């Protein structure tokens, strides 16, 4: 597992997670991956932030199947309507939005994966999601 040594978080990740934690948000990860997800997050130094890990290997489906989103919601005891979601794939962000999440598509390094749909929910930094949450809760 030497590939784990190269995993680092984006620069704004820790500050954004700290902000959400300080505001009392429950935080979870939904990923199309195996149970090694937790090890990956730990290697990035982020494991202390998350209350829930939902991976496709246990869900039996990949995003954007509603089942994986529902498993994550259930694990946190929240509804989609009170949840924020961010993904670097449009189709997965759209899947969450179709279920009632406020869902953002994050574009990293200018790469937008050729999406042709609505661009209203595009962000370029996790700070933008925190700014949105701050505005909505004032």
Model-derived features: where do they sit?
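Metal-dependent phosphoesterase signature
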Residues: 1-11
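Asp-based, Mg2+/Mn2+-dependent phosphohydrolase catalytic module
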Residues: 14, 18, 28, 34-138
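Conserved ATPase "switch" residues in P-loop NTPase domains
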Residues: 21
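Switch/coupling loops of ABC transporter nucleotide-binding domains
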Residues: 25
